[in-house]
Amino acid sequence: MKYNFDEIINRANTNSKKWNPDIYKATYNGHNDLLPLWVADMDFRVAQPILDSMSKIIEHGVLGYTGVDEEYYQAIINWNKKRKNSHIEKEWVVFTNGVVPAISFMVQTFTQKGDNILIQTPVYHPFRMTTENNERNIVTNPLINNEGVYTIDFEDFERKIVDNNVKIFILCNPHNPVGRVWTKEELIKMGDICLKHNVLIISDEIHSDLIFKEHKHCSFLTLDKKYFSNLIVCTAPSKTFNLAGVQTSLIIIPNENLRKAYQKTLGNVRIETPNSFGIAAIKSGYTEGEEWLDQVIEYLDNNRNFIEEFLKENLPEAKYVKPEGTYLAWIYLGDVLKDREIEKFFEEEAKVAIDYGHWFGEEGRGYIRLNFACPKSILEEALNRILNSLK
């Protein structure tokens, strides 16, 4: 089946956090007339097999309590083996209703108030928020920024762990917002340091199905089993198949002791199984959604390249390195905007809703994160709004 990702679907009159003006205006100083390219979901219609599986539930007419069966687990296991070359066991899979709440429960389970947690800035800001909201402390290992290409400062990484008695390291792979897909060698270096100092690795791999053709994602689950003693991997069909509203995520915990401790925390708040639509989405997405996903990645690749071409031709002062994974463009506009206030420029002049770089840490100041998982016509309009507002 050929999918049409140029189709514009009106999401403004839904409860879309991204598109509903009455919702997003709280984030953008009351402005409700912006073109949204911020929240990390796609503006594409979901794969037809997933929609069909959900329609069957509605047609059946009963929405009772749910449980999961063998088909559910096999869909997850087979997908991970085929797409990611990772072997997981049925028993390792733990359900939560989202990666961010899942990480919050991990912080509560495996640390005490006042403990230190390491992140690599600029990074997805809920990592900081959920840590600090749980009364733990953030320690940063800033990524090295070489003209928009980011690498890891391993000496600083280990020094920060030792000096601060770090308990948890939250890794983002692929990295949001900078778009790096960490290599096997980079993961091994971080893994060995964490193993040496008994640091729990939480690897957020929610974007791991969205990798561009010249790169390959390497999960911690594909590495030496020695890392499994202190490893939790967070995945979900939400980014892969545009299902954030279904609120279903999959937490992979190979170590039995870690898994039991975590399940106890979840059991205390009665987080047990996905909802009816989450189960259907996982089964149908992971067994019949591959064709849709491959077409999405191809479309995203074209959008990724279009941004590069547009900026080179019209805004050469902007700094943009194409992401290796994710559908998020990380663009430096400090030399373009100069002394202009970035919020005022986007909200009052360009009228485009993006994520401001400083939301991801001070290292992101002057940057924007732009979501290009949208029809090309919308992306082109947003870029032209930015360009025309600079004239």
What does each model-identified segment do?
Residues D52-S53, K225-D301, E309-F310:
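Conserved core segment of the aminotransferase class I/II
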Residues V336, F345-I354, F360-K391:
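PLP-dependent enzyme catalytic core of the Aspartate aminotransferase-like
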Residues K2-G98, F105, G285:
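N-terminal small-domain helix-loop-helix segment of the aminotransferase-like
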Residues K283, Y299-E308, Y320-L333:
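Conserved glycine-rich beta-strand-loop-beta hairpin in the small C-terminal domain of fold type I
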Residues S55, E158-I161, G191, L195, ...:
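A structural alpha-helix within SAM-dependent methyltransferase catalytic domains
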Residues L63-D192, D209-L210, H217-K225, I232:
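Conserved core of the PLP fold type I
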